[in-house]
Amino acid sequence: MMPVILPLLLSLAIRGGDGQAIQGDRDLIAKLFKRYQEHGLSVKRACHTCDDGTECCDSRCSCPWNTCTCIPWGK
């Protein structure tokens, strides 16, 4: 078991030891996303329709008293 765990821990220490590699990955994703939008390419978003026909993208429905609104995730 120990020979399997040691290479995994070593790869994590090299990859994210100073946090720069992980931050660099986020920067790359942000650049690609921005380029996608600049060229007018659509970015697939999670959209669904609420009970009253309201369309919510990247959020959830809240329908008190049969009036639906979209609430961002995590709020």
Curated annotation (Swiss-Prot):
GO terms, molecular function: toxin activity
Tissue expression notes: Expressed by the venom duct.
Propeptide residues according to the Swiss-Prot or TrEMBL record: 20-43
UniProt subcellular location: Secreted
Keywords: Amidation, Cleavage on pair of basic residues, Disulfide bond, Secreted, Signal, Toxin
Keyword Chloroplast: no
PTM summary: Contains 4 disulfide bonds.
Gene Ontology cellular component annotations, sorted alphabetically: extracellular region
Primary residence: secreted
Signal peptide, first to last residue: 1-19
Tryptophan amide sites (modified residues): 73
Domain remarks: The cysteine framework is XV (C-C-CC-C-C-C-C).
Record-stated family: Belongs to the conotoxin V superfamily.
Name of this protein: Conotoxin Vt15.1
Lineage: Eukaryota, Metazoa, Spiralia, Lophotrochozoa, Mollusca
